[in-house]
């Protein structure tokens, strides 16, 4: 674990930035090496050295490295997006996930239309055995090429598999 490595003789990033002498009991030294000056500067700008020091003092030693990693990530994101921070990143990923789920439903609908499966029996959102068999059979890269003009039966026969009925 990084917090238990022997220290070099130079000051930690926190003491360098704060222009103070680094003591052997410095709470920042195990987690902000002298080479991590930019990381500590971001954490200091967002949270403040005093708050980080108090926080690290309250966290059990075995969890401090993860705490520092979390603070560094939050500070990085907060500086990029001061209003929303990590929540903005999460919301963006959730929006992207919904878009991809929609695209998947559209692709499944098109596949069902081309496969000859009765659309009233199978929903494009269901994981039907017929659809699962087709998706396992067709390479992912080829799914992107199916645009409605492709003869699906011929494609399946080219793979050596009969079309499912």
Swiss-Prot record:
Pfam families linked to this entry: LOB
Positions of the LOB domain: 10-111
PROSITE patterns: LOB
InterPro entries associated with the record: LOB (IPR004883)
Family membership noted in the UniProt record: Belongs to the LOB domain-containing protein family.
The protein's name in its UniProt record: LOB domain-containing protein 21
Species annotation: Arabidopsis thaliana
